[in-house]
Design a protein with these regions (language model features):
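Conserved ABC transporter NBD signature motif
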Residues: 68-76, 83-84
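Conserved ABC ATPase "signature" region
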Residues: 108, 112, 119-137
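Conserved ABC ATPase signature
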Residues: 141-145
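Conserved catalytic motifs of ABC-family nucleotide-binding domains
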Residues: 162
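Catalytic Walker B motif of ABC-type/P-loop ATPase nucleotide-binding domains
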Residues: 166-169
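ABC transporter nucleotide-binding domain
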Residues: 184-270
Length: 270
């Protein structure tokens, strides 16, 4: 809707009172609510097991919710699942493409699943490979790409449908800082071109470098949310505790603007 109607435009993502309880009895989400505005770069920050991937799975219709509502640009995922899914692209944490295909073929074949004509798909594939800094790898075997290149290929594939909302689940997990920064560059360019981006991460540095708004989730509950700078200022004063799966490392990482202190073997004071 336009501003002249007096009605605000729909949020890129609107989540209301979202619950998820698995068959095992585990409550992964406990009444999560949040809004992501069009054009935003938004982070879901939290430790492993906090509920980030479950939330993304529900939004992407890969996981069934127990209760609550989800809308993508005003389209309810229960009322019009296909319509909502056409508006978003998903980059999962796992590499899930054929390593024996060429990058261009991976993108073109993916576009075909969405009914995009081959001639148009070929043009888009070249555009997305260039944007992902993979133009010179279009005809290489995907298995020969570096780890960072493979992850950028996943982003290029998701962008083939021209989604208005791009969701990335732990896109830089397990990669070194140089690969991480190369991916940040690609994501900034995509966001600058108008695509709303949501990423899950447990790296505070990543959220701080990329995102304008942030929600901190722990044990299925949003514990803080709001503008990045305001939350960082608040955390400078208040701090927060993160429960970590498994023992903390002997040497804690250094994060600019934050002090990390081990409370016990599984709890980190930030």
């Amino acid at each position: 809707m336009t501003e002249t109607t007096g009605v605000p435009a729909a949020a890129a993502l609107s989540v209301r009172d979202l619950h998820k309880t698995y068959a095992t009895g585990v409550q992964a989400l406990k009444g999560v609510s949040l809004d992501v505005q069009p054009g935003d770069f938004y982070a879901l920050l939290g430790p492993n097991g906090a509920g980030k991937s479950t939330l993304i799975g529900i939004v992407s219709s890969l996981v069934n919710k127990s209760a609550g509502s989800v809308e993508v640009f005003g389209v309810d995922i229960d009322e019009d699942r296909d319509g909502a899914m056409r508006l978003l692209g998903l980059v999962p944490q796992e590499l899930n493409f054929n390593m024996f295909e060429k990058p261009r073929d991976i993108l073109v074949n993916y576009a075909g699943f969405y009914g995009i004509p081959r001639a148009q798909a070929l043009l888009r594939a070249d555009e997305e490979l260039q944007r992902a800094y993979l133009g010179d790898k279009a005809d290489a075997m995907s298995r020969t790409l570096s780890g960072g290149m493979k992850r950028r290929l996943m982003i290029a594939r998701a962008m083939m449908t021209r989604p208005r909302l791009l969701i990335l689940d732990e896109p830089t997990a397990g990669v070194d800082i140089e690969i991480r920064r190369s991916m940040w560059k690609t994501l900034r360019e995509i966001n600058a071109a108008g695509t709303t981006i949501i990423l899950t991460t447990h790296y505070l540095e990543e959220a701080e470098n990329l995102c304008r708004n942030l929600a901190i989730i722990d044990r299925g509950v949003i514990v803080e949310q709001g503008p990045m700078r305001a939350l960082l200022s608040k955390l400078d004063v208040e701090g927060f505790l993160l429960d970590i799966d498994g023992p903390l490392p002997a040497s804690l990482p250094q994060i600019e603007g934050a002090t990390l202190q081990a409370v016990d073997d599984n709890t980190l004071d930030v």
